[in-house]
Amino acid sequence: MLKVNLKFIKKRRKELHITQAQMAIALGLSSSSGYNHYENGNRRFTANLMPMMAKILKCSIENLYT
């Protein structure tokens, strides 16, 4: 089973100078604290968010999984 690579997502977001608030808005989430729960592993990213996340982070979907 594939797992979301949370370390990669956080690292890549920071490399691109994207804030958690910006990620939340781009993904259609209600708040940056909501996004924070996903990035810290307290909530699971849903499959439908992954294509948009790959686009925002300028990477392939495969990079988002371990």
What are these regions (language model features)?
Residues 1-15:
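A short, Lys/Arg-rich alpha-helix, primarily the initiator
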Residues 10, 21, 51:
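Residues within the helices of the helix-turn-helix
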Residues 13, 24, 54:
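The alpha-helix within a helix-turn-helix
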Residues 17-37:
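Short alpha-helical DNA-recognition segment
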Residues 26, 63-66:
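Short amphipathic recognition helices of helix-turn-helix/homeodomain-type DNA-binding modules
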Residues 48-63:
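DNA major-groove recognition helix of helix-turn-helix/homeodomain DNA-binding modules
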